[in-house]
């Protein structure tokens, strides 16, 4: 079996090269109605789990912050935010995007699969579009559970990205998404955002474990094994995606993993 530490370094290199382009996507989100949609979603989940707690009393960790989208929204909500990423280039973009809020967020370069925090350090751990790309997602979930306080909340937004590399039906649906985007005159986010890096990402996706596993079933099984109470909202995309995203990624709907530590 391939040494997945090699994949980790390839990820670091790939996302360093994608930092500027991915940051542009996040800035677009911050400048549109997507900003409020996502902020409302995060607020609702936090309030549901912590109805008696003020936002400024919640210590929240964002894993894989990228250009800082979630970190910025959580800071605007008033949370005490720590945001980590594997790549310094992404953290640099995140700080720029955060503007005046940058100084209120603790930015850290760190591996999502090997956190350096003490046990029970955070009330909530959040992540978006990260888990699928990890060489050791089982280790990542174990770490995220470890740093959660009793009664803590894990929110993980992800999708079956690159499942089309292993499934003929998924491949056909993916190709239909490309045709639909072209026919509707909508920019193809899947191809445009990655540009010349597309083949590199597909190569990595072929070698990480989650591209060929059924999700969110795998995630729920793993979290239950860790002792967390977990469920999946497989319609979250209907709430947070733009019309353009719905067209681009129709065959790969986003899901939300909601897991709680130590309580039902």
Which residue stretches match the model-derived regions?
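Conserved class I S-adenosyl-L-methionine
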Residues: 1-55, 70-73, 153-192, 198, 202
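Class I SAM-dependent methyltransferase SAM/SAH-binding core
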Residues: 61-63, 67-114
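A short glycine-rich, Lys/Arg-flanked "PGG" loop and its adjoining helix->strand segment in the class I
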Residues: 138-150
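Short alpha-helix
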Residues: 209-227, 232-233
């Amino acid at each position: 079996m391939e040494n997945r530490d090699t994949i980790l370094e390839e990820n670091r290199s790939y996302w360093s090269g994608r930092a500027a382009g991915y940051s542009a996507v996040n800035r677009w989100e911050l400048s549109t109605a997507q900003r409020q949609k996502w902020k409302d979603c995060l607020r609702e989940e936090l309030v549901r789990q912590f109805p008696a707690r003020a936002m400024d009393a919640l210590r929240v960790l964002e894993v894989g912050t990228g250009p800082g989208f979630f970190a910025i929204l959580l800071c605007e909500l008033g949370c005490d935010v720590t945001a980590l990423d594997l790549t310094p280039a992404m953290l640099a973009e995140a700080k720029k995007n955060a503007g005046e809020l940058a100084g209120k967020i603790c930015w850290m370069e760190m591996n999502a699969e090997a956190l350096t925090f003490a046990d029970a350090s955070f009330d909530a751990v959040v992540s978006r579009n990260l888990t699928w790309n990890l060489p050791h997602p089982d280790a990542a979930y174990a770490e995220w559970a470890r740093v959660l306080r009793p009664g803590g909340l894990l929110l993980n937004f992800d999708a079956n990205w690159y499942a089309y590399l292993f499934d003929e039906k998924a491949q056909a649906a993916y190709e239909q998404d490309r045709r639909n985007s072209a026919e509707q005159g909508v920019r193809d986010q899947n191809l445009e955002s990655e540009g010349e890096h597309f083949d590199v990402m597909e190569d990595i996706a072929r070698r990480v474990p989650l591209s060929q596993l059924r999700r969110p079933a795998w995630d729920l099984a793993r979290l239950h094994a860790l002792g967390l109470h977990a469920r999946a909202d497989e319609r979250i995309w209907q709430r947070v995606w733009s019309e353009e995203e719905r067209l681009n990624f129709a065959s790969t709907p986003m899901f939300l993993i909601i897991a709680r530590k130590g309580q039902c």
